């Protein structure tokens, strides 16, 4: 059987169109425009592309983006001072600091300094803690986007065995909490996991977020599994995921492509989080 493609490109367009309608409605009522501050430290080419996509999406939905492009030499205290200003700015609803940061800046200290109500990336320990307590508000964008993609399949996740490959703070760990919240039985694998293949073969739902091209053989995929590939890698000038796509697509019921799968959803959920923060910014 050939897997059905879960298109993040299409779903993200629908989500952004709905957000744009809501924002237009607020502005017609005489309310201010939602505001997102985007901070980029240094000139990492990949980060510049990601930030550019986020700013473009802001324009598409009607969010005012305020840009801070800072030099590589920016100190931690200088960045903290900017965050202090943005935390106090009533016209800014969301604050996004593009990761990774230069080595002289402690990313955890920066994330913890952002007002949790403006943490639209969903990385602040307070927001991760709320998800852990089953009362989520601002949720990590990539896992949140994956949950929206899974919803489109119509599959009931209760009791399904979900296997996550990768245990990062940005994807793997919050992803495990999202899937637990949805009623799945969750296994998280990581670099110390023995016999990765055995775990993958048992997955009804497989989410891979490592950043190693074709790490997961298509032969390992369980028949009729739902396969979500979060990885994005450049190989011979082409973008590929962490999963051997063609072979996996022969066995899976549903699969996300790379590009055009999870990536667009991450940005769409950032826009969604920004509107949520705006609506709750009292």
From Swiss-Prot:
A Pfam family that the UniProt record links to this protein: THF_DHG_CYH_C
CDD domains given in the database record: NAD_bind_m-THF_DH_Cyclohyd
Keyword field contains 4Fe-4S: no
Keywords attached to this entry: Amino-acid biosynthesis, Histidine biosynthesis, Hydrolase, Methionine biosynthesis, Multifunctional enzyme, NADP, One-carbon metabolism, Oxidoreductase, Purine biosynthesis
EC numbers on record: 1.5.1.5, 3.5.4.9
GO molecular function: methenyltetrahydrofolate cyclohydrolase activity; methylenetetrahydrofolate dehydrogenase (NADP+) activity
Annotated positions binding NADP(+): 166-168, 232
Superkingdom per UniProt: Bacteria
One annotated Gene Ontology cellular component of this protein: cytosol
Catalysed reactions listed for this entry: (6R)-5,10-methylene-5,6,7,8-tetrahydrofolate + NADP(+) = (6R)-5,10-methenyltetrahydrofolate + NADPH; (6R)-5,10-methenyltetrahydrofolate + H2O = (6R)-10-formyltetrahydrofolate + H(+)
Claim: Transmembrane helix is one of the keywords in the record: no
UniProt pathway annotation: One-carbon metabolism; tetrahydrofolate interconversion
SUPFAM superfamilies noted in UniProt: Aminoacid dehydrogenase-like, N-terminal domain, NAD(P)-binding Rossmann-fold domains
One BP annotation, GO: L-histidine biosynthetic process
Function: Catalyzes the oxidation of 5,10-methylenetetrahydrofolate to 5,10-methenyltetrahydrofolate and then the hydrolysis of 5,10-methenyltetrahydrofolate to 10-formyltetrahydrofolate.
Subunit text: Homodimer.
PANTHER family: C-1-TETRAHYDROFOLATE SYNTHASE, CYTOPLASMIC (PTHR48099:SF5), C-1-TETRAHYDROFOLATE SYNTHASE, CYTOPLASMIC-RELATED (PTHR48099)
Similarity field: Belongs to the tetrahydrofolate dehydrogenase/cyclohydrolase family.
Protein name per UniProt: Bifunctional protein FolD
Species assigned in the record: Haemophilus influenzae (strain PittGG)
């Amino acid at each position: 059987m050939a897997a059905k493609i879960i298109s993040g490109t299409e779903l993200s367009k629908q989500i952004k169109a709905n957000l744009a309608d809501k924002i237009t409605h607020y502005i017609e009522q005489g309310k201010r425009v939602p505001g997102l501050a985007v901070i980029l430290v240094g000139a990492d080419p990949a980060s510049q592309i990601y930030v550019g996509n986020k700013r473009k999406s802001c324009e598409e939905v009607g969010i005012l983006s305020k840009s801070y492009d800072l030099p590589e030499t920016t100190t931690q205290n200088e960045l903290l001072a900017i965050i202090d200003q943005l935390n106090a700015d009533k016209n800014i609803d969301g604050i996004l600091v593009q990761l990774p940061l230069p080595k002289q800046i402690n990313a955890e200290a920066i994330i913890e300094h952002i007002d949790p109500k403006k943490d639209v990336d969903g990385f602040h320990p307070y927001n991760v803690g709320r998800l852990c307590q089953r009362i989520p508000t601002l949720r990590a964008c990539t896992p949140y986007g994956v949950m929206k993609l899974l919803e489109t399949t119509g599959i009931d996740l209760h009791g399904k065995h979900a296997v996550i490959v990768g245990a990062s703070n940005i994807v793997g760990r919050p992803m495990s909490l999202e899937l637990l919240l949805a009623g799945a039985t969750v296994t998280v694998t990581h670099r110390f996991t023995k016999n990765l293949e055995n775990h993958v073969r048992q997955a009804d739902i497989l989410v891979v977020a490592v950043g190693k091209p074709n790490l997961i053989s298509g032969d390992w995929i369980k028949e009729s599994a739902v396969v979500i590939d979060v990885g994005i890698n450049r190989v011979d000038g082409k973008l590929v995921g962490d999963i051997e796509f063609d072979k996996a697509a022969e066995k899976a019921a549903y699969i996300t492509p790379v590009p055009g799968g999870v990536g667009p959803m991450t940005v769409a959920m950032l826009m969604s989080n920004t509107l949520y923060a705006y609506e709750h910014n009292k």
